[in-house]
Structures are given as C-alpha cells and as structure tokens.
A protein has these predicted regions:
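N-terminal pre-core extensions flanking Radical SAM catalytic domains
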Residues: 263-277
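Conserved, helical-rich catalytic subdomain that frames metal- and/or nucleotide-binding sites
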Residues: 154, 159-260, 275-288, 294-322
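Residue-level signal for inorganic ion chemistry
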Residues: 13, 41-43, 81, 115, ...
Length: 322
C-alpha cells in the first residue's frame, strides 16, 4: 500500500510576462486555477537516513493513465519528480533510495503544469515521510525545481508573481464546466519567451491592484464577468500565429458557447469556460478527429488542501471525461 497524493493540473486564466530578470528568467503576473484533471503520485518505498552527502537513488514507474507512456520513456533524472526528490534529500541531508509510481493523465508540454504538479506532490510525500521543512521552506525548495511548483504546492485559485514563487491564494470558486483541448503540439517555452522580446525594463500596462480586486469579486460572485475584460495571455498571439491549429481550437470553443476561451501557459492547450456539459460535448464533436477535448471542473483551495493529505491506497484515480 502506497502513500498517494492527487496532483491536479492548472490553467492560466491570465498571464502577463513582465521584464526579463538578471538571472535570465522573466517576472510574470498570473491568475491560476486548479482543475480536476489529475495525475496520482505514490511514494511506494523510502529508505532514507541522515547523511552529509545527501545522495539518493530515485526509481519511477508508470501506473498507466492516458499519458502513462511518457513516464515509461523518461529517465528519472529527467522527470521533475526525480529532480524534486534529489533536491529534497540534498537539502535535508538524507541519502538512500526512494521509489515513486505515477498514474499520468495530464498531457505533457501542454501548459497544464503536470510535471510541476507531480513534483509538488513528491515534495509533499517526502516531507510527510521524513519531516524536514515547514511550508515556507518547502515552497522555496519547490521554486528551485520549477517556476510552477510553488503554486502547485498551494493549488486552487491564486495570483502568482515573481517568476512564480510569490503565491497569493484566493478564496471562492467559479462554477463553470471547463473544457480543455489537447492540441497535441509541443511549444518550446524558451522560444516563446524569446519571441516576446521582453527587455529588463519592460513594465506591465495592467493596473495590478484593480485586477486583484476584480479577481476577488469574480470568485466571490461565482462569475468571470467582473474580470473578463482584463484577462489575457501574452503568449497567445505569437503562439497562435505560429500554430494556426491552436487558434482554430480556441475559436471553436467560443463558437460552441464558451463564455471565455484562451490558451494556457505558453501552449499548446486551450480551455473554455462553459455553462453546461452539453456545450463541451458539442465542442468535442466539432473537434473530433483533430484534437482531444477533456471535460473537467475547477478545484477550489479547500479541495486541493484536502487532497494534499496522503491516503494509503492502490486504487486508480477516477477518470475525467474525454
């Protein structure tokens, strides 16, 4: 029986790319939301002991899932779960071996944060097995693994800044049906940043304080309307220009009734917010043969916190409609 955490996907409801930093990263400002599409990450074995060297051997196996083949073909050192485990043990002064198993359902390289969410789950599991860090230190550790990992440790609705390490959780919910279109296109994130051409002195045109207030109003009222006019993704125009199929999928969601549709992250997935599952079914039919449509919903901060508690189980995660 393994300790298991559900690792939720995310979408960027809003993503501004700000100035390029001296460390080569970019500052961003984003409204993120967790969705029920998820992987499951299990810590099957952990043989750890104090050590000055802090070296650890990591094994990762696939438990299947719609994207399980990715785990099978990826060396542990290239998987963010493996990187998270190695960093955790080095910082905690632990050596030995750990073994993870992942049921992979979140498309890879699609702007849905699957790898980061898996890494966040691995950090939680390791810290529960070998308590070493408080929440703040675990967030700092996560930022060294990947820019989205601090958010994935928090989940739900949140505003993120810096390069992603500054996370402000938001209360409330948006009771929409969410349709995700997996376009099956790999978009190079580094290339997308280069195409934006942000300089070190670039400043955002958005009034951030007003935006934050409108986000809170939207989540409190349960509708995207208060903030919809300010939402954007700075990558969307350049990526859609390079890959017309992504723009076509987004536009198809709008035509099928989405109250808001956009690209998430640097692509290639797009999402739509719908009033009913029937509208998502219509989008699935319209895109049949060209892209996969996943029906899901938002995950609140409370739901994410509850899932972060480990459960001893070998059960498969419930499926999300495709």
């Amino acid at each position: 029986m393994a300790d298991t955490i559900r690792a939720y996907a995310k979408i960027n409801l809003h993503l501004e790319v700000l100035n390029r930093r001296d460390d080569g990263y970019h500052n961003i400002f984003s409204l993120l939301a967790g969705i029920a599409l998820s992987d499951s990450v299990s810590l099957e074995e952990a043989d750890l002991r104090p050590s000055r060297e802090g070296g650890v051997e990591v094994a990762i196996r696939s438990l299947g899932g719609s994207c399980g083949h990715v785990i099978e073909s990826m060396p542990p050192a290239d998987n963010l779960v493996g990187k998270a485990a190695i960093l955790f043990c080095r910082k905690a002064g632990l050596s030995g071996s750990v073994s993870f198993a992942i049921e992979k359902n979140i498309p890879v390289g699609a702007g849905l944060g699957g790898g980061s969410s898996d890494a966040a789950a691995a950090l939680r599991l390791l810290n529960q097995t070998a308590p070493s860090f408080d929440d703040q230190d675990l967030m700092a550790l996560g930022s060294c693994v990947g820019s989205d990992v601090p958010y994935c440790l928090t989940g739900g609705f949140a505003l993120c800044a810096g390069r992603g390490e500054i996370v402000r959780p938001l209360r409330g919910d948006l009771p929409y049906e969410v349709g995700i279109v997996d376009c099956g296109i790999h978009v190079d994130t580094g290339g997308a940043y280069r195409l934006l051409g942000r300089s070190v002195d670039y400043q955002t045109p958005n009034a951030l304080t007003m935006f934050e207030q409108l986000c809170e109003q939207a989540l409190f009222s349960g509708t995207i309307e208060p903030v919809r006019g300010m939402l954007r993704n700075d990558f969307e125009d350049i990526v859609c220009g390079a890959y017309p199929a992504i723009a076509a999928a987004r536009d198809r969601l709008k035509a099928c009734g989405a109250v808001y549709a956009a690209m998430t992250g640097s692509g290639s997935s797009v999402f739509g917010l719908f009033s009913s599952s029937a509208e998502i079914d219509a989008a699935r039919e319209a895109l049949r043969g060209t892209a996969r449509v996943i029906a899901t919903r938002f995950v609140s901060n409370r739901m994410h916190a509850e899932s972060a508690a480990t459960r001893r189980s070998t059960e498969r995660m419930p499926d999300v409609a495709h």
